[in-house]
Structures are given as C-alpha cells and as structure tokens.
Amino acid sequence: MASLNKLSSNDIGNIDRQIAKLKQGQILTESEIKSLCIKAKEILSDEPNIIQVRAPLTICGDIHGQFHDLIELFQIGGNLPDTNYLFLGDYVDRGSQSVETFSLMLSLKVRYKDRIVLLRGNHENREINKVYGFYDECFRKYGNEIVWKQFTEVFGYLPLSAIVEQQIFCAHGGLSPAMESVDQIKQLNRVQDIPHEGLMCDLLWSDPEETKNGWGISPRGAGWTWGCDITEKFLHSNKLKQIARAHQLVMEGIQKVHNQKTITIFSAPNYCYRCGNQACIVEVDEQLRMNQTQFEPAPRENEPHTTRRVPDYFL
C-alpha cells in the first residue's frame, strides 16, 4: 500500500508549479494554501521532536519574512534537492513577505521532505506572530484570517530540535535548566502553542551568555541565558560536540562563543531592512567540518537600506 505521504505525479506537478509561482513573486491562492498545509501536516506529524540528521547539509538561521534574501540564500547555498538544508526557525514576522516565505518553505518540505528540515522558532506561535506582523500581512493579502489560521496550525507540527550526526545539537534558541538529557525532548507534546515556561519554551527562547557562567534571567522575558559551564556540562553528559542555534541578531551573521562550542547563525541580512548586518549559512561536510558563507541583502526595489546598530536582544 502506498504511503499516505507519497506524492502522486499530479501532486509533484502542482507543487512544482507553486514553487515556480512563488519564485516569480506571486502568492498562492487560499485553496492552494489549504491543500499545502494539509499535506505538510501529514509529513511533519511523522517526524519526531528531535530529528536525527545526516551530513552533508547546510544550516540556516532566522529568515523573518525576507523572501528575496531567502531566494538569494538558495542561490548561494544551492537549490533543493541538490543541497540538504536544516532551518532553525523564525520564518515569519518582521519582514514584509512572510506569506511568500513560509509558503515556499512548506512547498519545498512537501516536495523534498527528506532533503529539508524545518525546526520551530519562537515566532512560529500565534501569540507572537499576531503582534509582530504575520497576522496583519495574511489579512492584508487575503482579506481574512483563514490563511493565518491554517499556517499557525502547521507551526505546531514543526519539530523542536535536530542532532547532526549524533554530534551537533540544533534548536532555535538553546538550552534549558529543565533538560539534562536530550531524550527529555522526546516526551514533549509539541502540537500546541509555545508555553510561557519550561523545556519547550526554553528550547525556542534561550540565549548563550558570553561572560557569565550558570543560568541567568533572560532580558526577553522568556527562556534563560546560559554560560560556558552549562554548555560544557550539557555536551559532555549527552556525548555531543557543539550547539548550533539562531534566535539572535549577530552583525556578521555568525558568532561562536563558549570556546567555539555554541554557534549562533542568523540568515536575514540587513534585518528589518535597517540593521546593516550580514547573513550567514553554514555548510557541514561528512567530516563535520564547517564552512561558513556570509552574504549581503539581495537587490530589490522600494525598501529602505540604512545601516545602524541595534541592541543584542531583539525579540
């Protein structure tokens, strides 16, 4: 019997047309999005909370609705299915094309489900994206909240973490005082809005602290900060070598702290069209060597392009 997730030739043709349509700058219809979300939920519901990922692959950080820069990212990193991708979350909000961005991400997931992993970020949550742009954008482009509701249902099915070759732990935010073993992530019910505290919250909200050891109160109001000693203990007890995460704007697109064992990757250049930062993607080869590629914003019209420094902590 054929797998429920196996695409028919007709499905493949439809998805390929949708991908081409999106790349041409058109949005999908409501009915196309409804069908896409149904297929995506079927695929994602088969994935565990922690995805075991093989190298080679390319790890990418926040995208935040910067659709032109996502297209540029694929130009630089290589198109699917020739390149395997792991995205660390935050596909929506802030940027002006979150609808196109997440439509493309889901279309690629449905088309090449074994070639792309989409983790959940803290913005893949109703409470956040109703305020920071995604809800308003959906309403503006479709005239109702139906599409927003369909997309936000999918968010609950996105996995929470990944481990590359049993050595690199990946999550959107980071560590939690509630987690000694990564196996605890397996027990979570992820199909829900992100709680305000606890392990699931912390995985998507926490940040590394460069200068202090131990756990600290996060200035974000959710999650924690964690020091180098916490990283060392976590890696040792779970037989891991590194942590890769996103969640924080870093001006060069990548930042390594905690003796280079905690890596922050940010893939939205000139964040919010004003921050002046570079973006970065990180290729991991079969020997787990990392090759970072930094890039500037894709050329586009009618968007401000100014440079200014912003605080380290940006929701």
Curated annotation (Swiss-Prot):
Keyword vocabulary terms for this entry: Hydrolase, Manganese, Metal-binding, Methylation, Protein phosphatase
Residues reported in the UniProt entry to bind Mn(2+) 2: D90, N122, H172, H247
Catalytic residues as annotated in Swiss-Prot or TrEMBL: H123
E.C. numbers: 3.1.3.16
Binding residues for Mn(2+) 1: D62, H64, D90
Protein's UniProt keywords contain Ribonucleoprotein: no
Alphabetical list of Gene3D superfamilies matching this protein: 3.60.21.10
Protein name, entry field: Serine/threonine-protein phosphatase PP2A catalytic subunit 3
Cofactor: binding comment: Binds 2 manganese ions per subunit.
Basic and acidic residues: bias regions: 298-315
Record-linked InterPro entries: Calcineurin-like_PHP_ApaH, Metallo-depent_PP-like, PPA2-like, Ser/Thr-sp_prot-phosphatase
Segments of this protein annotated with the region Disordered: 294-315
GO MF annotations in UniProt: metal ion binding; protein serine/threonine phosphatase activity
Family: Belongs to the PPP phosphatase family. PP-2A subfamily.
Recorded superkingdom: Eukaryota
Modified sites of kind Leucine methyl ester: L315
Cofactor(s) required, per the database record: Mn(2+)
Key word ATP-binding present: no
Cellular-component GO terms for this entry: cytosol; nucleus
PTM notes: Reversibly methyl esterified on Leu-315 by leucine carboxyl methyltransferase 1 (PPM1) and protein phosphatase methylesterase 1 (PPE1). Carboxyl methylation influences the affinity of the catalytic subunit for the different regulatory subunits, thereby modulating the PP2A holoenzyme's substrate specificity, enzyme activity and cellular localization.
Organism of this sequence: Paramecium tetraurelia
Substrates-to-products reaction catalysed: O-phospho-L-seryl-[protein] + H2O = L-seryl-[protein] + phosphate; O-phospho-L-threonyl-[protein] + H2O = L-threonyl-[protein] + phosphate
SUPFAM superfamilies the UniProt entry points to: Metallo-dependent phosphatases
EC class name: hydrolase
